[in-house]
Amino acid sequence: MSKKPTTKKEVQTTGHSWDGIEELNTPLPRWWLWTFYATIVWGVAYSIAMPAWPIFASGATPGILGSSTRADVEKDIAKFAEMNKAVEDKLVATDLTAIAADPELVTYTRNAGAAVFRTWCAQCHGAGAGGNTGFPSLLDGDWLHGGSIETIYTNIKHGIRDPLDPDTLPVANMPAHLTDELLEPAQIDDVVQYVLKISGQPADEARATAGQQVFADNCVSCHGEDAKGMVEMGAPNLTDGIWLYGGDANTITTTIQLGRGGVMPSWSWAADGAKPRLSEAQIRAVASYVHSLGGGQ
């Protein structure tokens, strides 16, 4: 009886064999192979039609279709700027103290000011404006330099101790009493106890009494005789329990020893020919927004 012929195509092997097990050389399905070729063609076509290959001088090849997401974004920004132009012109022309009486400006500054704050201010002052160590809360009404809308506007526009803006608020730094040899270490320890006492914290009574005299001789010119601070000097109230850098003994000691001198950047200053970080309308919007948070005076 003859063997029945078969038309089944034998699958080739790679020639490798191990313990009777051979490695097959099965070709890829045709549909998969043609899909692979199609992706190559698509990739080449896309790189010709659209921006694709990096170029040091101009960023990337432009593509023959001239598509640019950056240009699209710029068009959208220009469109919305044109939409808001009328209300922004009105905002710039309105006295700062009159903004709160204009419903249209109130609505605009609450929304636009919040957007500016989230973009430029939240990194330091927090998303909810509650502040961080070294960056004041804008909610509590405790203002080192004043909380009127005019003052808030000026501080945003020109900054505080910003060395680049000649119109910045030139308030004095907290001196480094140990580094500059203004006080002896024992005197610093005494005045720390006095500050703890007047801020309602546990303190060494004997050292606090000695520290009161040190305070009177060295600190009242900025913090005032009642230790409640002076806006003109940018000196904080030491009796209310609100602390910019911390109110524990170690932090107060560090502050007195090494001093403090935080910088609020100027948001209107720009180098020659450069564009300011914030426009006049944006500064007014965020100033009005901050003033409305509950801490404004």
Swiss-Prot record:
Residues 57-297 are periplasmic. GO terms for biological process: oxidative phosphorylation; proton transmembrane transport. Binds 2 heme C groups per subunit. Residues 108-199, 206-294 form the Cytochrome c domain. Pathway: Energy metabolism; oxidative phosphorylation. Disruption phenotype: No oxygen uptake activity by the cbb3-type cytochrome c oxidase complex can be detected. Heme c 2 binds at M174, C219, C222, H223. The keyword Membrane applies. Signal peptide: none annotated. Pfam families: Cytochrom_C, Cytochrome_CBB3, FixP_N. GO terms for cellular component: plasma membrane. It is a single-pass membrane protein. Component of the cbb3-type cytochrome c oxidase at least composed of CcoN, CcoO, CcoQ and CcoP. Interacts with CcoH (via transmembrane domain). Belongs to the CcoP / FixP family. This is Cbb3-type cytochrome c oxidase subunit CcoP. It comes from Rhodobacter capsulatus (strain ATCC BAA-309 / NBRC 16581 / SB1003). The gene is ccoP.
